[in-house]
């Protein structure tokens, strides 16, 4: 049973008490802090005064499905040249801090910055910085039941695709910012392999004004997607299409897109083209291609 030391010399038996973070776990807790003079991946990293130096170094200390938590400390930063392998199931990575003090990860090289191959992993409150060349994605998700929450997925000239989904089911992105900062980005989230079922993307912002538009789609799927939900997302600076799930063709509804707002970066012939829904139901989505004009329903057609 875990023991948490309190300031007056008391001990708390049971789940570790992690300050005011609201995180309870019976697993092990590890700290990562590039700003610490004592940082080393050779440390046990269970004490914030002797943390690991890298995210990947902390992952190597975790036990699968043990409820382990990794805290990336405020101001932590890494330049990643070999993909961070989230290959231990059930690990939760939490970035501490707010604003630009949240942990910042910069990929360099022909890599996916983080490669999630294990199931039930979580990443929260981390900023992924774009690059000038080579990087293929900020996060690749191949493990089922992945959660990404309050992430900043930045795309400069690369990566062309912010997040790739490689056959994972039940992934969930919430309250994330996908941000274009230089010309080049093609897609925010690309579901690139097979039918990823029962996934959710909600309360996210896809903002590509800073990249003079997003070339292909905020969310794109190349295969049929069953049970997907896109909810309450804002798409700003779309060149062509905000959501492209045209490979889903079920007449009975494969999923739903609801409550989304879309701003095209240039005039389009028909705002209906801002969503290519395939077999997805559309409910109360709005789009516009001109400033100072009210957005119209997408699609314009209403049910008979």
Pin down the residues of each PLM region.
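Predominantly polar beta-repeat domains that present long G/T/S/D/N-rich surfaces used to bind, process
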Residues: 3, 10-11, 228-304
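Glycine-rich repeat segments that build the extracellular carbohydrate-interaction surface of secreted
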Residues: 30-35, 53-79, 91-98
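Short, T/G/N/S-enriched strand-turn elements that build extracellular solenoid repeat scaffolds
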Residues: 55-64, 78-88, 103-105, 111-117, ...
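All-beta strand scaffolds that present successive hydrophobic residues in beta-strands
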Residues: 72, 92-95, 118-124, 146-150, ...
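Right-handed parallel beta-helix/beta-spiral solenoid domain characteristic of secreted/periplasmic
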Residues: 90-139, 150, 156, 180-182, ...
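Residues in short coils/turns that link rungs of repeat/solenoid architectures in beta-rich domains
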Residues: 100, 130, 155, 160, ...
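Solenoidal tandem-repeat scaffolds enriched in leucines and small polar residues
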Residues: 160-220, 224-230, 235
């Amino acid at each position: 049973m875990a023991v948490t030391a309190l300031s007056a010399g008391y001990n708390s038996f049971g789940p570790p008490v992690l300050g005011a973070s609201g995180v309870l776990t019976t697993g092990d807790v590890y700290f990562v802090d590039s700003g610490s003079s004592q940082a080393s991946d050779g440390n046990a990293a269970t004490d914030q005064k002797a943390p690991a130096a890298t995210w990947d170094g902390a992952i190597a200390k975790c036990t699968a499905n043990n409820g382990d938590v990794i805290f990336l400390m405020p101001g932590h930063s890494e330049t990643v040249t070999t993909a961070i392998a989230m290959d231990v199931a059930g690990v939760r990575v939490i970035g501490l801090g707010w604003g630009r003090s949240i942990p910042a990860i910069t990929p360099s090289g022909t890599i996916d910055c983080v490669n999630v191959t294990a199931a039930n992993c979580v990443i929260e409150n981390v900023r992924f910085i774009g690059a000038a060349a080579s990087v293929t994605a900020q996060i690749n998700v191949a493990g089922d039941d992945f959660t990404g929450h309050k992430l900043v997925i930045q795309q400069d000239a690369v990566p062309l695709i912010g997040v790739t989904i490689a056959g994972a089911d039940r992934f969930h992105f919430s309250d994330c910012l996908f941000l274009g900062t230089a010309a080049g980005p093609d897609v925010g989230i690309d579901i690139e392999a097979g039918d990823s079922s029962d996934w959710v993307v909600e309360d996210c912002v896809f903002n590509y004004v800073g990249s003079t538009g997003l070339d292909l789609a905020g969310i794109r799927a190349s295969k049929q997607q069953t049970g997907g939900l896109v909810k309450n997302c804002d798409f700003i600076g779309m060149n062509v299409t905000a959501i492209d799930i045209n490979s889903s063709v079920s007449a009975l509804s494969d999923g739903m897109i609801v409550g989304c707002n879309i701003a095209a970066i240039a005039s389009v012939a028909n705002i209906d083209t801002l969503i290519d829904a395939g077999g997805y139901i559309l409910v109360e989505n709005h789009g516009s291609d001109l400033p100072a004009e009210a957005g119209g329903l997408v699609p314009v057609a209403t049910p008979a």
